[in-house]
């Protein structure tokens, strides 16, 4: 039924009269006004998109990496075949002793958290006095054909160890966004199994799932036929990121596909510059082996929540061993990681937890700076078994949840140190390799 409903919705959206020039009054009017120039321009846009192999959503020439997007000052201080580690310049005289290591999803580019100075979570965190590090994952190529989930777990453990050693601290705060949050849960389970849980002071999960039993429309794309097709598309050892972009766009076809068909192909309108849509179209390739196992083992078979069903190397993964304090954020309108699916992490972690339901979805629900005064979030300090119970007793607070997170972080260590020595990128034992945002984020 779900597949029929999804297919029907897609068909109805595609066949909307607004999507055809002779049944859209606005297109007809503009065609008469311009003598058909709008259709000529639209055809040119369409041909350019066909050549690129991707539907455009914004003016791609309006942004330059490190200049007006991903521009928070910092240095790449470590590079491996899988990731670069970026350390950001402090802007305060004192910083919190416990640093923050952010793991963004490798399905997209890390700078979703550093779009511009007004929207940047990274810049905001630095301004709060947090020593901030982020991992920039390499977009997959043929050399990464054998990369599997174990490698990403090992990379997270390595990044945590690197920052601890660099700054001489006992532990770090961590953030995992989407698939990197799922991986962070596995990483914490591995550390717990190895009696190394003390390396992480806290874990924050942005729209991250561990139980995929109610993972939304993406569950419709993991049957044997779909997996076989994805395998065929990954013949060079990686999946071209444009396929993933098309998949995510199809989940909201009206907004992310047909809206641009009408405005740009039919109306001939110019593409407006929009940093979020630039990021959305800046795709990354995925290692084929990792992608196949991720869809099969997590989405289809839901193995992660069964203790011992999955391993990282020889270490069994058991989420119930995780005692690390956790801050769990979900988006009320998230169509990629539905809030009810994210909620399920509450049943598997055993340490203290705080759940926050943010207004909006998978991106805007996360990237919501306080200065914007947009949306809202809900909190509920009473114990709840279900998301419905949480919502029923929740308190709505206008604006961004970032301040709530900051207060929570301070509750897990508020001692400060001078922002000098190794707290300055390149001034510790790890020298600067290049300026942020680094070269990996620019690789296609």
Located regions from the model:
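Short beta-strand immediately N-terminal to the catalytic nucleophile in serine-hydrolase-like folds
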Residues: 174-176, 206, 329
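Alpha/beta-hydrolase active-site loop
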Residues: 146-167
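Alpha/beta-hydrolase-fold enzymes
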Residues: 1-33, 39, 165-169, 187-293, ...
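Catalytic histidine neighborhood in serine/cysteine hydrolases
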Residues: 295, 345, 349-384
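Short beta-strand/loop motif that positions the catalytic acidic residue
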Residues: 322, 328-330, 334
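Short, surface-exposed "cap/lid" segments of acyl-processing enzymes
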Residues: 45, 49-141
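Conserved alpha/beta-hydrolase "acid-adjacent" motif
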Residues: 335-341
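Alpha/beta-hydrolase fold nucleophile elbow
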Residues: 163-180
């Amino acid at each position: 039924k779900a597949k029929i409903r999804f297919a029907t919705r897609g068909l109805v959206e595609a066949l909307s009269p607004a999507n055809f020039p002779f049944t859209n009054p606005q297109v007809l009017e503009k065609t008469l006004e311009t003598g058909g120039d709008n259709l000529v321009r639209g055809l040119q846009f369409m041909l350019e998109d066909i050549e690129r192999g991707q539907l455009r959503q914004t003016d791609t020439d309006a942004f330059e990496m490190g200049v007006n997007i991903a521009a928070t000052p910092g240095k790449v201080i470590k590079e491996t075949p899988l990731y670069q580690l970026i350390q950001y310049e402090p802007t305060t005289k004192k910083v919190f002793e416990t640093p923050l290591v952010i793991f963004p999803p490798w399905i997209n580019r890390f700078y979703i958290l550093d779009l511009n100075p007004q929207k940047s979570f990274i810049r905001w965190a630095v301004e709060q006095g947090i020593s901030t590090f982020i991992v920039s994952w390499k977009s997959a190529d043929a050399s990464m054909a054998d990369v599997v989930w174990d490698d990403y777990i090992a990379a997270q453990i390595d990044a945590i160890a690197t920052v601890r050693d660099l700054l001489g601290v006992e532990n770090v705060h961590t953030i995992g966004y989407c698939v990197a949050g799922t991986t962070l849960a596995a990483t914490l389970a591995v550390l717990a199994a190895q009696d190394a849980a003390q390396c992480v002071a806290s874990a924050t999960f942005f729209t991250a799932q561990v139980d995929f039993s109610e993972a939304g429309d993406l569950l419709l794309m993991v049957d044997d036929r779909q997996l076989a097709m994805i395998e065929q598309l990954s013949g060079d050892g990686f999946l071209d990121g444009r396929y993933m972009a098309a998949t995510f766009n199809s989940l909201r076809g009206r907004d992310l596909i047909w809206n641009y068909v009408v405005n740009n192909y039919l109306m001939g309108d110019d593409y407006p510059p929009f940093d979020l849509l630039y990021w959305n179209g800046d795709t990354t390739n995925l290692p084929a082996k990792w992608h196949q196992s991720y869809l099969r083992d997590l989405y289809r078979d839901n193995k992660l929540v069964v203790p011992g069903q999955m391993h990282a190397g020889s270490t069994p993964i058991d989420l119930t061993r995780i005692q690390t304090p956790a801050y769990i954020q979900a988006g009320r309108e998230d169509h990629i990681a539905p809030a009810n699916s994210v909620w399920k992490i509450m049943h598997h972690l055993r340490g203290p937890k705080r759940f926050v339901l943010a207004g909006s979805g998978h991106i805007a629900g996360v990237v919501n700076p306080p200065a914007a005064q947009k949306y809202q979030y809900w909190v509920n300090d009473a114990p709840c078994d279900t998301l419905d119970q949480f919502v029923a007793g929740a308190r709505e607070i206008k604006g961004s949840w970032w301040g709530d997170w900051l207060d929570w972080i301070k509750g897990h260590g508020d001692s400060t140190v001078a922002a000098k020595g190794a707290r300055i990128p390149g001034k510790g034992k790890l020298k600067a390799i290049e300026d942020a945002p680094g070269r990996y984020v620019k690789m296609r």
